[in-house]
Amino acid sequence: MNYNELKDFAHHAQAMISSGAVEDRLRHYLSSKLPSIFPDSPWWIQAHMEGTEAHVRFSTGQRNREGFVDAVVGKTAIEYEKNLTQQVIFDEGYHQVKEYCAALHNIGIPAEEILGILSDTVRWYGYSITIVGDVEDGHLYGPDNIELTQTAVVDLSQETDEEFRRFEVFVSQFLDREQSRLLNASTLVTDFGMDSSFYSQNISVFRDTIIRAMSEKPDYAALIQQVWQNF
């Protein structure tokens, strides 16, 4: 992590918050700065961008409803607000974290693997969840079924080395954690598809291996080629 870039981001983001910037401006500013703060390009930065405004489903009262979460990174739901020093805004964001964590549980993710984040891009609150109560047949889990336990807090507005280190740990715990990625087609394409770093780094080896195998066993290669052409 580049601490100088993080410090620069924290200073400017706090100035934006103090001047009354809306949530979207803060969120877009964060997204634009993440690649310079994390120059090693961890997987979750791309996931953070692609998971923006993800479609989710959960219940409110006795009704199932649909919504859009600010960001989903693997099994972590993120809610951004414009200024978490204002209690009314914090409370609204806290409730939405519960909604979005319920939505992750509704798609089959075990509660112990779900984490939630509430942030204004400068202050970061991290939560684990517990499922409480039961749901009736045909109904989804909702915020009333989610109990949040705060497990980490970071305040980058302090602009201290200690808080910057805490943020690095926070990111590792909530965004870059092991086994947090969903195993689906989108993830596989991101990791191994034609636009991935894996592809660009290894395609020449694969190509040479295939060409050599085809030249050594042309009859077998012709059979395989025919099978794929008729697939």
Residue ranges and their predicted role:
Residues 42-74:
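Active-site metal-binding core of divalent-cation-utilizing nuclease and nuclease-like domains
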Residues 4-55:
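Acidic-basic catalytic patches of nuclease active cores, encompassing PD-(D/E)XK
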Residues 63, 74-89, 102-231:
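Charged, often flexible domain-edge or linker segments that flank or initiate folded functional domains
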Residues 33, 37, 100-103, 107:
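Conserved short hydrophobic interaction patches
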Residues 25, 29-33, 92-100, 166, ...:
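Alpha-helical scaffold elements adjacent to nucleotide-binding pockets in ATP/GTP-utilizing enzyme cores
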Residues 14, 18, 22, 26, ...:
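Conserved aromatic-histidine-acidic binding/catalytic patches
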Residues 68-71, 80, 94-100:
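Well-ordered mid-protein domain cores that form the structural environment of catalytic cofactors
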